[in-house]
Regions:
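Conserved AMP-binding/adenylation subdomain of ANL enzymes
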Residues: 126-144, 148-217, 244
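Conserved AMP-binding/adenylate-forming
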Residues: 1-27, 145
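Short hydrophobic alpha-helices that are characteristic scaffold elements of the AMP-binding
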Residues: 10-16, 38, 150, 159-163
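ANL superfamily adenylate-forming
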Residues: 49-99, 203-217
C-alpha cells in the first residue's frame, strides 16, 4: 500500500538504475509469486503484513536474492531491514539515469485475460508527469487515494505532484477517505468515477445547506479540484460537482 517507505523504495530503485515493479498488495500470494517470477525480480521489498508472501517466495521464486522488510528494525539471516539499510547507506547516487533505459514494469489488471507487464522507460514516466499543464500552483495539497501500483496514481499523484512542488498526503485506507479529507484539508484529489460517485452521495446527504457550506462540509474549505481518470465519468456527475 502507498506509504512513505514505499516512495523511498521506489525512488531509490529507479534513481540507482534499477527497475521497480509495483505490485497489488491485495493479490493472493500465489498470484504475486507468478508476477515476481515473470518480472525476473531479484529483490522483494514487502510489508510485514504480507509475511505469508515472504515465506512462499523463498521456495517459489528462485530468482530472488534479497528479501527486505519495511517494518523490521534489524536485519537477520533471512530478511534485510529497510530501516537498517537506510541508516547504513545514506548518501547520493553516482548514477545518472538514461532517458530510454527501463524504469518501471507495471502489470495490467488482467480484466481481459492474463495480466501483461508494461515496460516504461525513464522518459515515459517523466513525460507522463510533465506533458499536462494543470495550472496547479506550488505547495498545492494533494490527497493521494488511488492504488500506487497503477500508472494513473504514480504518474499524476506522485510524479506530477513532486514535479510541481506539491504537498502529497497519503490516504491510508479507502475506508477513511472522508476522515482524511477532513484531516489533511486538501486542495485537490485524483479519483476514478466509482469513487467520485461515492463522494457525490456525500454531497447529496448535506444538500439542504447553502452550496458553499455543502462543499466545506464534504471537502473542506481549501478544496477546489477533482481529477477523474481510468474510466468514463457521466456528464451528470460533472454538472453535480459544478454546482459546488
Amino acid at each position: 500500500a502507498t506509504s512513505y517507505p514505499w516512495l523511498v523504495t521506489y525512488f531509490g530503485t529507479v534513481n540507482s538504475g534499477s527497475v521497480a515493479v509495483p505490485l497489488d498488495v491485495s493479490l493472493p500470494a500465489e498470484d504475486l509469486c507468478e508476477l515476481i517470477d515473470r518480472a525476473d525480480a531479484t529483490v522483494l521489498v514487502a510489508d510485514e503484513l504480507r509475511k505469508d508472501l515472504m515465506e512462499i517466495v523463498k521456495s517459489r521464486c528462485p530468482k530472488l536474492r534479497y528479501l527486505i522488510s519495511m517494518q523490521k528494525e534489524e536485519s537477520d539471516e533471512e530478511t534485510l531491514s529497510f530501516r537498517q539499510l537506510l541508516r547504513e547507506h545514506e548518501g547520493v547516487f553516482g548514477y545518472e539515469p538514461e532517458p530510454d533505459s527501463l524504469c518501471t514494469i507495471m502489470f495490467t489488471s488482467g480484466t481481459t485475460g492474463k495480466s501483461k507487464g508494461v515496460m516504461l522507460t525513464q522518459r515515459n514516466l517523466a513525460e507522463n508527469a510533465t506533458c499536462l499543464d494543470m495550472k496547479i500552483p506550488p505547495r498545492t495539497v494533494i490527497l493521494s487515494v488511488l492504488p500506487i501500483h497503477h500508472a494513473y496514481c504514480l504518474s499524476m499523484d506522485i510524479l506530477k505532484g513532486i514535479s510541481l512542488g506539491s504537498v502529497i498526503c497519503i490516504n491510508d485506507s479507502l475506508l477513511r477517505v472522508v476522515k482524511n479529507i477532513k484531516l489533511f484539508q486538501p486542495n485537490m484529489i485524483l479519483m476514478v468515477p466509482l469513487m467520485i460517485e461515492t463522494m457525490a452521495k456525500k454531497l447529496e446527504e448535506v444538500s439542504g445547506l447553502p452550496p458553499k457550506l455543502v462543499k466545506w462540509q464534504v471537502f473542506g474549505k481549501q478544496f477546489h479540484t477533482i481529477c477523474s481518470g481510468g474510466a468514463y465519468l457521466p456528464p451528470a456527475m460533472i454538472d453535480l460537482f459544478d454546482r459546488y
